[in-house]
From Swiss-Prot:
O2 binds at residue 59. Involved in oxygen transport from the lung to the various peripheral tissues. Residues 1-141 form the Globin domain. One of its GO terms (cellular component) is haptoglobin-hemoglobin complex. SUPFAM superfamilies: Globin-like (SSF46458). Pfam families: Globin (PF00042). InterPro entries: Globin, Globin-like_sf, Globin/Proto, Hemoglobin_a-typ, Hemoglobin_oxygen_transport. This is Hemoglobin subunit alpha. The keyword Glycoprotein does not apply. Keywords: Heme, Iron, Metal-binding, Oxygen transport, Transport. The lineage of its organism: Eukaryota, Metazoa, Chordata, Craniata, Vertebrata.
């Protein structure tokens, strides 16, 4: 459960997440593809899995914008992300094990770019991204 201090720390990052969604989202996806190549199987139309890949940039932007949107719903992250959880779990059949892999890559990417990231904010982000990963994996059939 996110504390009031966690929520405040996360909300302070929302603007940076939105401003850098495409670049940081693409970098996060590229990190995931590089560290866990099996995740590429869900992206059969992608030919360039680098952070510069056109489709990686587009999807990375969607991912990080969805994460930024979830920061507006910190009291109900799971409820807010439920439509995406249904899509990924029942339509796309994405293995829920992949969501923690991606959120870890997001956390690493943010830590690399946010020089002002204090340990307390890092911890708050980790807790929040764990909630995101759990929510997204909740409808796997």
């Amino acid at each position: 459960v996110l504390s009031a201090a966690d929520k405040t720390a996360i909300k302070h990052l929302t603007g940076s997440l939105r401003t850098n969604a495409e670049a940081w989202g693409a970098e996060s996806l590229a990190r995931m593809f590089a560290t866990t190549p099996s995740t590429k199987t869900y992206f059969s139309k992608f030919t360039d899995f680098s952070a510069n890949g056109k489709r990686v940039k587009a999807h990375g932007g969607k991912v990080l914008n969805a994460v930024a949107d979830a920061t507006d719903h910190l009291d109900n992250v799971a409820g807010h992300l439920d439509p995406l959880a249904v899509l990924h779990g029942t339509t796309l059949c994405v293995d829920p094990h992949n969501f923690p892999l991606l959120t870890q890559c997001i956390l690493v990417t943010l830590a690399a770019h946010l020089t002002e990231l204090k340990p307390e904010t890092h911890c708050a982000l980790d807790k929040f991204l764990c909630e995101v990963a759990t929510a997204l994996g909740s409808h796997y059939r």
